[in-house]
């Protein structure tokens, strides 16, 4: 890693994190698979939910022991909440259980698309900020909603790339890039819809600050390998963004300039 990228840490609410990858902890085939994926991706944070469900019904005690062993900062979420009251209550319960003021605020407005409820999201975010939480709201790429969330005290946003669990990658590149361009100083972490490492690399090349992954890793045939691949994709995309990519052109442009005679003719032309 170059000095340029090594000095470039993710900063949220004044705190710095070692990685721009955030990993969810749901739906892994086993606790060992989850543990291996965390070790492979070395995430800055891992998300946890009070309503967590894991395939195989693994004991909760083992799950929390695993998290303590990896010593990665926890980001509780309000997954499954559909009302403001439910989200606020769940956030307060999560603070008591996990001992942290961090909260990933999820408030779903549609069961089919799992799209966030923008009105309820703003109301819940405002209340939780007043209650002392560091709120990371899961939202769409809607610029106006993003600004309203910032107005009520959120210091970072988590816009989706596509609906949760679809793996489609970014379905509205224009909207997501406009959000980045219009909010240049706000930490933006793409959350939901990414399916393969190239999706993560792409949004990092656009200047996004990080990605949150769950299904793309947990439902891969080999989660540990996929987790490592995503971490590498995020690192490559961020490095490319910092390097300053060339501008795309509509016409061809020779990479080697033609100046004077070919080198083999410059000394009399003979071999």
Swiss-Prot record:
- Enumerate the catalysed reactions: [ThiS sulfur-carrier protein]-C-terminal-Gly-aminoethanethioate + 2-iminoacetate + 1-deoxy-D-xylulose 5-phosphate = [ThiS sulfur-carrier protein]-C-terminal Gly-Gly + 2-[(2R,5Z)-2-carboxy-4-methylthiazol-5(2H)-ylidene]ethyl phosphate + 2 H2O + H(+)
The biological pathway it contributes to is:
Cofactor biosynthesis; thiamine diphosphate biosynthesis
- List residues binding 1-deoxy-D-xylulose 5-phosphate: 165, 192-193, 214-215
Record carries keyword Cytoplasm: yes
GO biological process, alphabetically ordered = thiamine diphosphate biosynthetic process
User: Where does the protein principally reside?
Assistant: cytoplasm
Against InterPro entries, the record matches this protein to: Aldolase_TIM, Thiazole_synthase_ThiG, ThiG
Gene Ontology MF: a single term: thiazole synthase activity
What positions does UniProt annotate as the active site of this protein?
A: 104 (schiff-base intermediate with dxp)
**SUPFAM superfamilies xref list:** ThiG-like
- Which compartments is it annotated to reside in? Cytoplasm
EC number(s) recorded for this UniProt protein:
2.8.1.10
Could you name the Gene Ontology cellular component terms for this entry?
cytoplasm
Keywords associated with the record: Cytoplasm, Schiff base, Thiamine biosynthesis, Transferase
Q: Indicate the quaternary assembly.
A: Homotetramer. Forms heterodimers with either ThiH or ThiS.
- Give the UniProt family note: Belongs to the ThiG family.
What name goes with this protein? Thiazole synthase
Species the sequence originates in: Burkholderia lata (strain ATCC 17760 / DSM 23089 / LMG 22485 / NCIMB 9086 / R18194 / 383)
């Amino acid at each position: 890693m170059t000095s340029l990228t090594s000095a470039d840490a993710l900063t949220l609410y004044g705190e710095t994190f070692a990685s721009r990858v955030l990993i969810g902890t749901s739906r892994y085939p086993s606790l060992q698979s989850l543990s291996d994926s965390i070790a492979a991706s070395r995430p800055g944070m891992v998300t946890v939910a009070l309503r967590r469900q894991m395939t195989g019904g693994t004991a909760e005690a083992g799950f929390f022991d695993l998290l303590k062993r990896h010593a990665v900062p926890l980001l509780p979420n309000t997954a499954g909440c559909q009302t403001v009251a439910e989200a606020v209550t769940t956030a307060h319960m999560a603070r008591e259980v996990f001992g942290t003021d961090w909260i990933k605020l999820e408030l779903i407005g549609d069961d089919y698309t799992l799209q966030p409820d923008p009105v309820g999201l703003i109301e819940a975010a405002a209340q939780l900020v007043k209650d002392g939480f560091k709120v990371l709201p899961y939202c769409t790429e809607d610029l106006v909603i993003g600004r309203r969330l910032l107005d009520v005290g959120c210091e970072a946003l988590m816009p989706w790339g596509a609906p949760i669990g679809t793996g489609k990658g970014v379905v509205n590149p224009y909207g997501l890039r406009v959000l980045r361009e219009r909010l240049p100083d706000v930490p933006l972490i793409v959350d939901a819809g990414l399916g393969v490492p190239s999706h993560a690399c792409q949004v990092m090349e656009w200047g996004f600050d990080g990605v949150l992954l769950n299904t793309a890793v947990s439902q891969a045939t080999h989660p540990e390998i996929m987790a490592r691949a995503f971490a590498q994709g995020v690192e490559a995309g961020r490095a490319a963004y910092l390097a300053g990519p060339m501008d795309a052109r509509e016409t061809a442009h020779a990479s080697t300039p033609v100046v004077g005679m070919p080198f083999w003719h410059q000394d009399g032309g003979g071999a």
